[in-house]
Amino acid sequence: MSIRFARKADCAAIAEIYNHAVLYTAAIWNDQTVDADNRIAWFEARTLAGYPVLVSEENGVVTGYASFGDWRSFDGFRHTVEHSVYVHPDHQGKGLGRKLLSRLIDEARDCGKHVMVAGIESQNQASLHLHQSLGFVVTAQMPQVGTKFGRWLDLTFMQLQLDERTEPDAIG
């Protein structure tokens, strides 16, 4: 298994992983699936913004993906990113999520980001545990802010401070 930067050719596999999460889990709070063109547009927007899209790969097959983007679009949030990590269901439980997220944290630090945010459906114990094990702390619980599969969903926000800067725009 290897982790590498995604290529446009990976977007069909990324769409497949995304769509499985849409159809069968509460990890993505969308009801509509996407096609490869949608993921290509997403990929191009991320890379144009200077943000990484990573994939895990085994024997030439994309088994997961991870990325981060702006947490909010206002200038004051420029040092904060929100991430996503998804693993193909056939490859879950093998530590790929941990490897992808660990690499993504390194990429965020390399980009000079200060905080990484995770928005996690509050019943997703595997994701909550993974994030906690990598140093994320719970910062907010938001009951019944979403809905999927005919039920209310609660949202847990977690965050990881990526550096020790005391001044927001200090270099080094």
From Swiss-Prot:
What InterPro entries does UniProt report for this protein, alphabetically?
Acyl_CoA_acyltransferase, GNAT_dom
- Please tell me how industry or biotechnology makes use of this protein: Expression leads to increased levels of N-acylated L-amino acids which could be used in a number of applications.
- Give the knockout phenotype: Cells lacking this gene show a reduced growth rate and a markedly reduced yield in glucose minimal medium compared to wild-type; this phenotype can be partially rescued by adding L-phenylglycine to the medium, which reflects that other enzymes may also catalyze its acetylation, but with lower affinities. The deletion mutant strain also shows a consistent change in the level of several metabolites whose masses can correspond to L-phenylglycine, L-pipecolate or N4-acetylaminobutanal.
* Root EC class: transferase
Q: Which reaction does it catalyse?
A: L-methionine + acetyl-CoA = N-acetyl-L-methionine + CoA + H(+); propanoyl-CoA + L-methionine = N-propanoyl-L-methioninate + CoA + H(+); L-alpha-phenylglycine + acetyl-CoA = N-acetyl-L-alpha-phenylglycine + CoA + H(+); L-methionine sulfoximine + acetyl-CoA = N-acetyl-L-methionine sulfoximine + CoA + H(+)
Q: Which PROSITE patterns match?
A: GNAT
> Where does the chain bind acetyl-CoA?
V85, Y86, V87, G93, K94, G95, L96, G97, R98, N124, S133
The EC designation for this entry is: 2.3.1.-
Which keywords label this protein? Acyltransferase, Transferase
- GO molecular function: any one? L-methionine N-acyltransferase activity
N-acetyltransferase domain span: 1-163
List where the protein spans the membrane. Answer: none
Q: What does this protein do?
A: Acyltransferase that appears to be required for E.coli optimal growth rate and yield via the formation of N-acetylated amino acids. Catalyzes the acylation of L-methionine using acetyl-CoA or propanoyl-CoA as acyl donors, and the acetylation of L-phenylglycine. Is also able to N-acylate other free L-amino acids and their derivatives using a CoA thioester as cosubstrate. Using acetyl-CoA as an acyl donor, substrate specificity is methionine sulfone > methionine sulfoximine > methionine sulfoxide > methionine. Asparagine, lysine, glutamine, aspartate and glutamate are very poor substrates.
Q: Which PANTHER family match?
A: N-ACETYLTRANSFERASE, UPF0039 PROTEIN C11D3.02C
The entry assigns this protein to a family as follows:
Belongs to the acetyltransferase family. PAT/BAR subfamily.
Q: What is this protein called?
A: L-amino acid N-acyltransferase MnaT
Q: Which organism is it from?
A: Escherichia coli (strain K12)
